[in-house]
Design a protein with these regions (language model features):
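Active-site environment of divalent metal-dependent phosphoester hydrolases
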Residues: 86-91, 112-116, 143-154, 193-195, ...
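Proline-aspartate-enriched helix->loop->beta-strand connector
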Residues: 102, 241-245, 249-255
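Conserved catalytic scaffold of divalent metal-dependent phosphoesterases
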Residues: 148-240
C-alpha cells in the first residue's frame, strides 16, 4: 500500500523557535547542520530517573547510552495517548492541563496540519512551545506523522526536521527510546522511503535486544488488517507495521492516523494481535481530543470520546464488543 506523502511543494523547514537552548554565555544555540538532522540525529536513550537518584534536579530526562540497567528508574503506571491533533490548539491546551495526572503522555503523530492556512514553519514553532509546556508538566514523547514532514533529511527522504529541536530541548522524539522502570518506549518516525524503512527495521532489531519486561512503541499508522485502521469503507493500515508486530510482539503499540476507526461499528480503538495491544484513539471535534488512558497498574485501558467511554482489561485475549453503538 502506498504511504501518504508530504504535501506537494513542501519546503525545507527553517527554524524560528524563540526558545532555543541558551549556552553558558547567554547566546542562542544555532540550528543543527543539515547533516545532523533527521535520522542522523536520532538514537538517544532517555533514562527518566527518580528525583534524587542521579537524574536532573527536577527528575527530568538524562541521556544514557544503552539501557543503563544499573540505574534506578520510576515505573510507568498511567499513559495518555492522543494523536492527530492537527494544530487544534484547544486540544493541545487540554493535553497540557491533564498531563500532570499521567506518568507518560504520548503524542502519536500528525501534530501539524498541511491543510491549514498557517504555514508549517509557524505551526512547528507553536507546537514546540506546547511540547515545552508538556515537558514542564510531566513526561511527554512525540512521534511524527505524515502531516509533520517538513523537508528532506540527510538521506534525501522526507522527515519531520522540526522535531530535532524538541530533542534538543529534552523531549524524546523520532528515533529515541525512553526507559522508565521495567518499560521501554520506542519512538518510531514516519518513514517516507526505503532507507527510512530499512533504518527502522534495523533499529527495532537492536531495541529488541534491550527489551525489558514491557516494550511499547509509538508509531503513527495502525497495522494492516486491524479494526484500528478501518475507515468505514476500507482497511487502511500499514503492512510493514503488521509484520514488525508479528515478529517482535511488543506489549503495546500506540498509533493514530486513521481518524474514523473508533467511530465505526466495525472499527475499533483497540485490537490484540498475538500478545500485542494496538490502540488508536481517533480524531474528534471540540476542545477535548479523543484519547486513550492506559493504567498499567490496574491492567486496564479506556477510550474517551464524544460518543462515550469504553474499557478493556489488558489481560483479555481480545478486545471486547463495542458498547457505544
Amino acid at each position: 500500500m502506498t504511504r501518504p506523502r508530504a504535501a506537494p511543494g513542501t519546503v525545507a523547514w527553517k527554524s524560528t523557535w524563540s526558545k532555543h537552548p541558551i549556552d553558558r554565555d547567554g547566546r542562542r544555540t544555532p540550528d543543527p547542520p543539515v547533516e545532523a538532522r533527521g535520522r542522523a540525529a536520532q538514537g538517544r536513550t532517555f533514562d527518566w530517573l527518580k528525583p534524587g537518584s542521579g537524574g536532573s534536579r527536577r527528575g527530568g530526562p538524562s541521556f544514557a547510552s544503552g539501557n543503563g540497567a544499573a540505574l534506578l528508574r520510576r515505573p510507568i503506571l498511567r499513559i495518555l495517548l492522543v494523536s492527530d491533533l492537527h494544530y487544534t490548539l484547544p486540544q493541545f491546551d487540554w493535553v497540557v492541563h491533564v498531563a500532570p495526572s499521567f506518568d507518560l503522555v504520548v503524542l502519536a503523530g500528525d501534530n501539524l496540519d498541511i491543510s491549514s492556512a498557517v504555514p508549517l514553519d509557524v505551526q512547528s514553532v507553536v507546537v514546540l512551545h506546547y511540547l515545552e509546556l508538556l515537558k514542564a508538566a510531566g513526561k511527554v514523547v512525540v512521534c511524527s506523522g505524515n502531516h509533520d514532514l517538513t523537508g528532506p533529511d540527510a538521506q534525501g527522504e522526507q522527515s519531520a526536521l522540526w522535531l530535532a529541536e524538541a530533542r534538543v530541548a529534552g523531549v524524546p522524539t523520532d528515533g529515541d527510546a525512553v526507559v522508565l522502570g521495567d518499560t521501554r518506549v520506542t519512538i518510531c518516525p514516519w518513514w517516507d522511503g526505503p532507507l527510512g524503512r530499512q533504518a527502522l527495521d534495523q533499529r527495532l532489531e537492536r531495541e529488541a535486544a534491550l527489551r525489558p519486561a514491557r516494550w511499547i512503541w509509538a508509531y503513527h499508522w495502525p497495522p494492516l488488517g486491524s479494526p484500528t485502521c478501518w475507515t468505514g469503507r476500507r482497511d487502511y493500515g500499514d503492512a510493514d507495521l503488521r509484520g514488525w508486530i508479528t515478529h517482535h510482539q511488543p506489549e503495546i503499540v500506540l498509533t493514530g492516523h486513521v481518524h474514523e476507526s473508533p467511530f465505526k461499528p466495525t472499527g475499533s480503538w483497540a485490537d490484540r494481535i498475538g500478545r500485542t495491544w494496538v490502540f488508536n484513539a481517533g480524531r474528534q471535534i471540540g476542545p477535548v481530543p479523543a484519547h486513550v488512558q492506559i493504567d498499567l497498574a490496574a491492567g486496564q485501558a479506556a477510550w474517551h470520546s464524544l460518543m462515550g467511554q469504553e474499557m478493556l482489561q489488558l489481560a483479555d485475549a481480545q478486545a471486547p464488543q463495542r458498547s457505544v453503538f
